Amino acid sequence: MKAHPHMSLPALCALVSRYIVRLRVATCAASFVLPGLALADGSTPQIPGTPAGHALVAWLDAFNSGDSEKFASFAKVHAPWMGLDQEKALRASTGGYDLASIDGSDNLWIVFHAKTRVGGSRVSGSLVVRLKDPEHITLLNLVPADSKSAEIVLDEAERSRVIEASERLLAQFYVFPDVAKKTVAKLEALRKRGNYRSITDGEVFAVRLEDDLRVISGDKHFRVDYFAKEMPPFEPSSRPHPDPHKLAADNCGFEKADHLLPNIGYLKLNFFTEPAICASTAIAAMSFLADSDTLIIDLRDNHGGAPGMAALISSYLFEEPTHLDDIYDHTKDTIEQSWTFPYLPGKKLTGKTVYVLTSNQTFSTGEEFSFDLKNLKRATLVGDATGGGAHPVAPHWIDGHFVIVVPFGRFMNPITKADWEGTGVEPDIKVPAADALDEALKRAREEP
């Protein structure tokens, strides 16, 4: 993310439209003030003394400080995925933010207006913390104030309609019918209790509903998305395909293929893309690394993607056709087997030592890849346990503003029928994710 000191506010806000951070916050009931923090009109801000309020104060304090070391320390502890250069550029462009008003709040969310210290442009912000872990910010969203004013304001009828539609889709498509029934009952109880009554912001409502679905069901693959601009609904089978030009710009998720030492290959893979679009990139990367004695595959920042690409890369590691895993589809009541590819261009890496680096951010298809290679004893996993999401999903439009993503199946080992849902994939060598590469390199150097 790059910003310029004189860029327009819409362009600036586009950079941070889905800005997610993680903080450590406390809980209390009273309002409080932060020394040195003032409202845009010079008065003292009264921020609710709630988890959401504490989170807002903590972020503003770190962001507005202008102290690179302070922000680096903050990011290291609370938001290790944040790019310090990006934050520095954003801070230079805005000069920081002064609160203009607190427009609505609850324990877990807060909506506010702020002004940039450079130019005095108004932005609307919304922040949501997680229900089960209020130290974790689920959403921090900043958009131009004029664009926010054009959004719909949710009323009770709209909120109820979205929740009831979500309940119907959950009952129809969710992979575990018994869990779906219990989740629907608890969600309906929350609605009748008035848990969503004060939420009029679409983005906040979507995130709160998503969080409740995940907590009640225990399934991290649930997602609820909100679109301020009304979108034309589409069926899951006809949803837009990935943009090949954007994928090419991102190198199809292959961040780096390199030789760290003459005999140690390194592949940094951040997401799995469809082989129909990106097979040539995968083939080029694996061919480049084919002569390595040891291969390190870094999935610490891999959040998932297409299972077909995971199977393609796995195919370079096995000599014979190999049954990788099974995928159960609840909507069709079928089991689809995943095997390595029978033919591949280029050399294979059979017989070579393989390490896979994992973290708690490794998710979904990244976990499938790790799970398969571990169970087949084809790789040694190094790092932290993975995120714990083993369910493929499909989107369902509720209307032109809301879409719910429902898990409809599950990956599983073809022999044990086990998966990693909720628990993650445990590494063979457990070390902090930040130390995983050094640990793998150390062990690779010690190999005969």
Protein language model annotation of sequence segments:
Residues 22-36:
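Bacterial N-terminal signal peptides
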Residues 304-353, 391-398, 408-414, 424:
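Gly/Ser/Thr-rich loop/hinge elements
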Residues 1-22:
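N-terminal secretory signal peptides that target proteins for export/translocation
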